[in-house]
Amino acid sequence: MSSNVIEIYADGACKGNPGPGGWGAWLSFAGHEKELWGGELVTTNNRMELTAVIRALEALKRQCSVRIYTDSVYVQKGITEWVHSWKARNWLTSDRKPVKNVDLWKALDSLVQQHQVEWVWVKGHAGNVGNERADALANKGVDQVLGREVV
């Protein structure tokens, strides 16, 4: 782990798709850690995956070098590959349909312009400690919106 890079593990969870969902992010920098989580009563897994990354980037107080770990190919490819074409087509897909979750994609696109971001895809539920922590936080977000006790 490089000490001058903020490492972010982000994950989303959904009980039903759509259904109640949660997002979680674990930030680590120079021995300091921060946990973020939340949720929505009616959402989708993709919205929660995007929200996790957005909330993590919003928590940064200044321009930073950031390494974001996600198990969502949708988020990773969306922001590194697809977003450029979407913007060129005024937020339409290649078959001229509106991009889903455009509100979140626009927010994420704006936030990544403010930082130096490296995107790393990790396999979900495969024992990666950071990803497991983000997953637990996302599930905490689900529990919170469902009124379950959050520990």
Swiss-Prot record:
Its cofactor is Mg(2+). InterPro entries: RNase_H, RNaseH-like_sf, RNaseH_domain, RNaseH_sf, RNaseHI. It is found in: Cytoplasm. PANTHER family: RIBONUCLEASE H1 (PTHR10642:SF26). Endonuclease that specifically degrades the RNA of RNA-DNA hybrids. Belongs to the RNase H family. This is Ribonuclease H. The gene is rnhA.
